[in-house]
Every structure is written in structure tokens, then in C-alpha cells.
């Protein structure tokens, strides 16, 4: 699974409960986008979560 290159956010695991309260393991996956960003003056392709994109932690290359 992919992780955010900025904040390190990755998938989380937990339980999905049925109505009768039986458990099965499930995953919550972060919303990761492939983005061209400027790092040290050069455009680089990064995997970034949408929370970091909205917060402006990445300067996108046009």
C-alpha cells in the first residue's frame, strides 16, 4: 500500500462489526494522489494525501 510522502499517512486496520457483533478485519485506506511537485527547484512525482494537498504543504509543478 502507498504512503503519503509528506506526512507518512498509510492504511489503518481495524474491525468491521456485523449486526450480530461478529468481527472481521478491514482496512481504511488514505486518499493518495500522484502529484508532480517542486522539490529543491526540480519537479518530482510524489504520492501525497489529499489532506496535505488541501493544507498547501506541497507546491505543485505546472
Curated annotation (Swiss-Prot):
One of its GO terms (biological process) is translation. Gene3D superfamilies: Ribosomal protein L28/L24. Pfam families: Ribosomal_L28. InterPro entries: Bacterial_rp_bL28, Ribosomal_bL28, Ribosomal_bL28/bL31-like_sf, Ribosomal_bL28_bact-type, Ribosomal_bL28_sf. It comes from the Bacteria. Keywords: Ribonucleoprotein, Ribosomal protein. GO terms for molecular function: structural constituent of ribosome. GO terms for cellular component: ribonucleoprotein complex; ribosome. Belongs to the bacterial ribosomal protein bL28 family. This is Large ribosomal subunit protein bL28. It comes from Thermoanaerobacter sp. (strain X514). The gene is rpmB.
Amino acid at each position: 500500500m502507498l504512503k503519503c510522502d509528506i506526512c507518512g499517512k498509510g492504511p489503518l486496520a481495524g474491525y468491521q462489526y456485523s449486526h450480530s457483533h461478529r468481527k472481521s478485519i478491514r482496512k481504511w485506506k488514505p486518499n493518495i494522489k500522484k502529484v508532480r511537485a517542486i522539490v529543491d527547484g526540480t519537479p518530482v512525482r510524489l504520492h501525497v494525501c489529499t489532506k496535505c494537498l488541501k493544507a498547501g504543504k506541497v507546491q505543485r509543478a505546472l
